[in-house]
């Protein structure tokens, strides 16, 4: 909530504390996976879904184990304000109804995030984009 002063915010996990390193790791992951098609339940080059991409990124780049499903990823860590986002924070969207209508990505920098988009596969998008701004749900720090 907006009445929390920033000193009360949780620091990121130690593995995510150096933003420069985190951004480099996310860029590397994006270049390795960019264009991989979206496939629900997928966890491979043949196709990956949004929470699978997040899980693999945190496992392979930060040695952190996250839950497999978006709805479970939305319960870990601490909710933070959108304007407090740091590289490696998770961004969640409600793009439809019910649990299948949830979407997750990883905040990068400059108001951008990397994710497995249903229409274009693994890519970088902007939080300023009308669609993502309209459907933004919450941000979480791991």
Q: Which residues fall in each region the model found?
A:
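Short, small-residue-biased leader/transition segments that mark boundaries at the very start
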Residues: 1-6
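Post-signal-peptide N-terminal segment of Sec-exported extracytoplasmic proteins
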Residues: 8-46
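Aromatic- and glycine-rich peptidoglycan recognition patches
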Residues: 13-18, 80, 97-102, 107-142
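Conserved catalytic core of Hanks-type protein kinase domains
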Residues: 32, 60, 107
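Catalytic cysteine-centered active-site loop
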Residues: 36-87
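Structural motif
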Residues: 88-90, 111
């Amino acid at each position: 909530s907006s009445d929390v002063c920033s000193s009360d915010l949780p620091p990121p996990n130690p593995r995510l504390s150096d933003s420069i390193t985190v951004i480099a790791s996310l860029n590397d992951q994006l270049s390795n996976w960019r264009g991989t098609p979206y496939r629900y339940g997928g966890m491979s080059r043949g196709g990956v879904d949004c929470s699978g991409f997040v899980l693999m990124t945190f496992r392979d780049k930060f040695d952190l184990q996250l839950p497999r499903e978006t709805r479970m990823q939305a319960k870990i860590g601490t909710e933070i304000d959108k304007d407090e986002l740091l590289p490696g924070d998770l961004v969640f969207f409600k793009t439809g109804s019910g649990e299948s209508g949830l979407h997750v990505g990883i905040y990068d920098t400059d108001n951008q995030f990397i994710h497995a988009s249903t229409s274009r596969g693994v890519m970088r998008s902007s939080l300023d984009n009308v669609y993502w701004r309209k459907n933004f749900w919450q941000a979480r720090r791991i």
